[in-house]
Amino acid sequence: MSHSLVVVIPDLRAEHSARLREAAARFGFECHICSSSAQSRRFLPEAEVILSADHSLAGQAPNLKWMCSHFAGVDPFLKEGVFASPEAILSNSSGAYGVTISEHIVMLLLDILRRNPEYQRNIQQRAWIRRLPIRSIYGSRILMLGTGDIGQEACRRLRAFEPSFIKGVNFHGNNPGNLFDQVKTPEKLDSLLADTDLLIISLPGTKATFHMISTPQLRLLPGHAVIINVGRGTVVDQAALEEELQNGRLYAGLDVFENEPLSAESVLWDSPRAVITPHVAGDTSLQHTVDRIVNLFLEDFENYCTGRPLLRQIDRSIGY
């Protein structure tokens, strides 16, 4: 059986396809670039490598050896029975989304701090109301849950606004690039929350991060604190957050939710204390993101074909 690479990514340009085909040919792979998952299905029985975020493809590829998600988050791939080939390795595209998602973080923060949703509602009613007190990132105390690519890129951008400090939380306690003023492990999280004005979450959805922010943590935050979540919705206990917002505490900028799409009954749709976007912070219509996805994959594709370890391989037991 010949080696086979199957690619299903939206927004690929011709130059991306050409580079993928060239790399595949160099290492003796047939390359099938498909516009949809449905189109890819006839190639799956012989697929050795798949580049796609559609976890359902892994269950239809009995000869799969490597599944590379073009997303950074891989939680759908971690469920029991997803892979038809249990020994298949899994990797992600961490490093592709830092630019676009960090810009989304800044947008959500400024939207809330500068009261833009309220101004827009007033404008739609042709009401010229100018006296809405605003706040600033300048001088704010920032805590970032997650110090990977997204957290680091956000930290770089937020430094320009001159906050009082930017602290981080990760599972290793290391300070990547010494970007953060201080980094702690999750065991110290509660002790950091009382001194936090802006809480920014970019953590993956894993067993260890499930409801890391729930009622006890929300109650430790100052009432004026802003929570931004661009990681996974399961990191925040959504019901607990909704209750705090309804009680007039906290503000939230959310791109991810516990269940997606967000239920039409959710109070978040109409909450004056929330700004929501429909999981679009990492949208691949930004060509820089697709460029990065392809570059990162080709780097690991060469590693795979030459017997070297993958740089972005996921430990499926912990989810990152």
Ranges and model annotations:
Residues 164, 173-267:
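Rossmann-like adenosine-cofactor binding region
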Residues 120-153:
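Glycine-rich NAD(P)-binding loop of Rossmann-like domains
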Residues 102-118, 160-161, 295-303, 308:
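Oxidoreductase and adenylate-handling cofactor-binding alpha/beta cores
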Residues 224, 230-320:
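Rossmann-like dinucleotide-binding domain for NAD(H)/NADP(H)
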